[in-house]
């Protein structure tokens, strides 16, 4: 908060809760899977109460901002009444600490008679099937457009967008377009705005932190423009995109690895002979996407190689073990390994 950024923490309950059931298996649901908390066990409520108390109470609480998110998405619809009771209970539980509470839309999918607190509650409107935006506003909820069809990024997954369609968002989307079937009028009271979401569903698939940033920065730019200005027919998307590429990420920040101007290295296109311990470095700490690296490897008789083949800030690439059995592996800053399907050659064979 001291830097002017409100980080909204989320403890995702009662589904998507494997982190808790790994620690405490007895509160997991035998019927619906261990990613669901068992809503019929008293121990579940004792555990969640103590967890929230730990993060929200005391002289130095962990959650210091004004808002806290409690998840509540994608619980099994067969338990609608119990889910609604659980949700209502923890909306009130968080509020007693003086926090504004947020939740994912679920009450269209989990219809029922059990009332769920609406005052001072903000809902992420993420799916037509799960939330009725008009009914939610009528009941007194505030909503944020987080429509999965338009605003979800799930890198390299195949079932949601890998990159947002920034051109379509700039030219066609508006914050009232809460899902493909429903649209709210401009200026609808209770519609606070919109946001995109990134879900890294697949770990170890070769997608690095930089890869995620490469996807999210253009999304942040176009949504910021739409939130502040709305539709702008005076500036084409092509002009807007050109301006975006000229804008830095922040003072002194270059996570995209942009290189200004054309770089020509002396001695390019010339053959260089190394003695086995040499290294070559450029004046550039990194080069962002799009880029390509081409090189050849012609190993000598020594087969035991364990070292970095080439590296930038993120990630280094290295052969592991003996050359003939090795693969190129990418190692990120958080030590996740991803394998590139290229075997290094034996002595006397060239690799390119």
Task: Name each model feature, range by range.
Residues 88-93, 107-113:
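N-terminal active-site wall of soluble small-molecule enzyme domains
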Residues 113-121, 127-269:
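Flexible, acidic glycine-rich loops studded with aromatic residues
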Residues 340-352:
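Trp-centered recognition loops
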């Amino acid at each position: 908060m001291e830097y002017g950024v409100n980080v909204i923490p989320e403890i995702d309950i009662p589904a998507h809760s494997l982190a808790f059931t790994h620690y405490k298996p007895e509160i997991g649901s035998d019927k619906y899977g261990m990613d669901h908390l068992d809503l019929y066990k008293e121990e579940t409520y004792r555990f969640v109460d103590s967890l929230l108390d730990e993060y929200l109470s005391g002289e130095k609480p962990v959650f210091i901002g004004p808002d806290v998110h409690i998840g509540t998405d994608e619980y099994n619809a067969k338990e609608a009444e119990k889910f609604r009771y659980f949700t209502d209970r923890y909306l009130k539980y968080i509020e007693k600490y003086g926090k504004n509470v947020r939740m994912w839309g679920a009450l269209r999918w989990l219809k029922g008679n059990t009332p769920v607190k609406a005052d001072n509650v903000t809902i992420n409107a993420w799916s037509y099937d799960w939330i009725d935006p008009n009914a939610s506003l009528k009941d007194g909820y505030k909503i944020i457009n987080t429509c999965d069809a338009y605003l979800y990024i799930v890198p390299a997954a195949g079932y949601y967008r890998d990159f947002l369609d920034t051109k379509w968002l700039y030219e066609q989307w508006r914050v009232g377009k809460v899902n493909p079937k429903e649209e709210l009028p401009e200026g609808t009271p209770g519609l606070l705005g919109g946001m995109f979401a990134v879900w890294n569903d697949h770990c170890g698939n070769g997608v690095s932190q930089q890869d995620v940033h490469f996807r999210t920065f253009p999304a942040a730019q176009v949504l910021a423009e739409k939130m502040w200005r709305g539709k702008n027919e005076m500036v084409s998307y092509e002009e807007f995109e050109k301006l975006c590429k000229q804008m830095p990420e922040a003072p002194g920040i270059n996570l995209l690895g942009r290189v200004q101007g054309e770089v020509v290295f002396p001695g390019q296109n010339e053959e260089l002979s190394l003695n086995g311990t040499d290294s070559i470095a450029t004046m550039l700490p990194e080069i962002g996407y799009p880029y390509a690296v081409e090189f050849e490897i012609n190993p000598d008789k020594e087969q035991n190689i364990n070292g970095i083949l080439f590296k930038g800030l993120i990630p280094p690439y290295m052969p592991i073990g003996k050359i003939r059995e090795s693969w190129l592996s990418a190692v990120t800053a958080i030590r996740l390994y991803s394998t590139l399907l290229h075997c290094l050659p034996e002595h006397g064979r060239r690799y390119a």
